[in-house]
From Swiss-Prot:
Functional summary from the UniProt entry: Required for vegetative and sporulation septum formation. Required for the activation of genes expressed under the control of the sporulation transcription factors sigma F and sigma E.
Gene (name only): divIC
Protein name as catalogued: Cell division protein DivIC
Pfam families found in the cross-reference section: DivIC
InterPro entries, sorted: DivIC, FtsL/DivIC
GO biological process terms held by the UniProt record: cell division
Length: 125
């Protein structure tokens, strides 16, 4: 009784089955479109994140370089202000006639009336 028979079953063609198959195909197409849109959107978000990160990194490095230059210029400004105050003091001293004569005697070996200059070297120990 074991007969090997092939059973061929024909599918029933009705409107409901065709409608369900169309709905399934439509769902598959929509899902495939959704995956494509999400992939493109994800790629755009990723590229935007890379651009923003590189921009932030370059601005950070630029900012740190400018801060270093600012510190250097502030130090230079401080030294120039100190030099300016020293020069103002020197100008006020040069307006004093006694100071100018003392400088002339010390640096230029000038003498007053009736004075003789003796150059004595200091002994080093």
């Amino acid at each position: 009784m074991n007969f090997s028979r092939e059973r061929t079953i024909t599918e029933i063609q009705n409107d409901y089955k065709e409608q369900v198959e169309r709905q399934n195909q439509l769902k598959k197409r929509r899902r495939k479109g959704l995956y494509r849109r999400l992939t493109v959107f994800g790629a755009l978000v990723f590229l935007t994140a890379i651009v923003l990160a590189s921009s932030v990194w370059s601005q950070t490095s630029s900012l740190s370089a400018k801060e270093e230059k600012k510190e250097q210029l502030e130090k230079e400004l401080k030294s120039l202000k100190t030099k300016q105050t020293d020069l103002k003091e020197e100008i006020s001293k040069l307006k004093d006639e006694d100071y100018v004569t003392e400088l002339a005697r010390r640096d230029l070996f000038m003498s007053g009336d009736g004075e003789i200059i003796f150059n004595v070297e200091k002994k080093s120990k």
